[in-house]
Curated annotation (Swiss-Prot):
<feature type="repeat" description="Lumazine-binding 1">
    <location>
        <begin position="1"/>
        <end position="105"/>
    </location>
</feature>
<feature type="binding site">
    <location>
        <begin position="154"/>
        <end position="156"/>
    </location>
    <ligand>
        <name>2,4-dihydroxypteridine 1</name>
    </ligand>
</feature>
<feature type="binding site">
    <location>
        <begin position="4"/>
        <end position="6"/>
    </location>
    <ligand>
        <name>2,4-dihydroxypteridine 1</name>
    </ligand>
</feature>
<protein>
    <recommendedName>
        <fullName>Riboflavin synthase</fullName>
        <ecNumber>2.5.1.9</ecNumber>
    </recommendedName>
</protein>
<comment type="function">
    <text>Catalyzes the dismutation of two molecules of 6,7-dimethyl-8-ribityllumazine, resulting in the formation of riboflavin and 5-amino-6-(D-ribitylamino)uracil.</text>
</comment>
<feature type="repeat" description="Lumazine-binding 2">
    <location>
        <begin position="106"/>
        <end position="205"/>
    </location>
</feature>
<feature type="binding site">
    <location>
        <begin position="170"/>
        <end position="175"/>
    </location>
    <ligand>
        <name>2,4-dihydroxypteridine 1</name>
    </ligand>
</feature>
<keyword id="KW-0808">Transferase</keyword>
<dbReference type="InterPro" id="IPR026017">
    <property type="entry name" value="Lumazine-bd_dom"/>
</dbReference>
<feature type="binding site">
    <location>
        <begin position="109"/>
        <end position="111"/>
    </location>
    <ligand>
        <name>2,4-dihydroxypteridine 2</name>
    </ligand>
</feature>
<dbReference type="GO" id="GO:0004746">
    <property type="term" value="F:riboflavin synthase activity"/>
</dbReference>
<comment type="subunit">
    <text>Homotrimer.</text>
</comment>
<dbReference type="Pfam" id="PF00677">
    <property type="entry name" value="Lum_binding"/>
</dbReference>
<feature type="binding site" description="in other chain">
    <location>
        <position position="145"/>
    </location>
    <ligand>
        <name>2,4-dihydroxypteridine 2</name>
    </ligand>
</feature>
<keyword id="KW-0677">Repeat</keyword>
<dbReference type="InterPro" id="IPR017938">
    <property type="entry name" value="Riboflavin_synthase-like_b-brl"/>
</dbReference>
<dbReference type="GO" id="GO:0009231">
    <property type="term" value="P:riboflavin biosynthetic process"/>
</dbReference>
Length: 239
């Protein structure tokens, strides 16, 4: 679990399409450097949120200035990590500790989809970004003043246009210095993880409704039965 408060900006040093080494897992791997600041207490097998994606550390260099991660096909489908190349900058955050304040919000590192920056404009000392979701079904989980993780950064939604599958955020000057988004422009992609709370509520309601519908003695089934009977009676009376 992560907080969405980026600790460090690293640099992609190497991307291997088919890494046959023990630490590569016979798939896509990535080496990220310029990050000794966050590697002091990280062990092999630990998780590091990389541009919003929870990735497992599989290798260090001797100086602990860089680390390797493997990237699964599912991650490549869901995120934009496949677009990264040597020189790309990435947001990094270590997994949260029990004694860390939750200054952002609960971020799993499980990216749902990507979005494209469709507008960027200055607003005093802030930068306002507008994004368009690739997969519109995730728009229902995005609400004004709610949380959202963009490239692993915990941000507050300022506006939502559900019909266009678009939403906006405003980034204050302090955050601009700590994350990679100010380096991006219109047309660039970002990783999106919607707030888990909305998903949990939706699933609980869905399962509860299904349970009530299947139970003929439940209050909901009784109510539906009465409504259907009333509708049928009304139709018969008109005929």
């Amino acid at each position: 679990m992560f907080t969405g408060l980026v600790e460090h900006i690293g640099t992609v040093l190497q991307v291997t399409e088919k890494d046959t080494t023990a630490s590569g897992g016979d798939g896509v791997s990535m080496v990220i450097g310029d990050c000794s600041k966050i590697l002091e207490d990280v062990q092999l097998g630990d998780s590091i949120c990389t541009n919003g994606v929870c990735l497992t550390v599989t290798e260090f260099d001797m100086a602990r200035s860089q680390f390797k991660v493997g990237i699964s096909p599912e991650t490549l489908r869901r995120s934009d990590l496949g677009e990264l190349k040597p020189g790309s900058k990435v947001n990094l955050e270590r997994a949260v500790k029990a004694d860390v304040r939750m200054g952002g919000h609960v971020v799993q590192g499980h990216v749902d989809t990507i979005a494209t920056i469709v507008n960027r404009r200055g607003d005093g000392n802030a930068i306002n970004f507008t994004f368009k979701l690739r997969d519109s079904q995730y728009g229902k989980y995005i609400v004004e003043k709610g949380f959202i993780a963009i490239d692993g950064t915990s941000l507050t939604v300022t506006d939502v246009d559900h019909e266009q599958s678009e939403f906006s955020i405003s980034m204050v000057s302090y955050t601009q210095e700590k994350v990679i988004m100010p380096l991006k422009n219109s047309g660039d992609s970002v990783n999106i993880e919607v707030d888990l709370t909305g998903k949990l509520i939706e699933k609980q309601i869905e399962l509860s409704l299904l349970s009530y519908i299947k139970d003929e003695t439940s209050p909901l089934s009784t109510l539906i039965g009465k409504l259907v009977e009333k509708k049928v009676d009304d139709v018969l009376k008109r005929n």
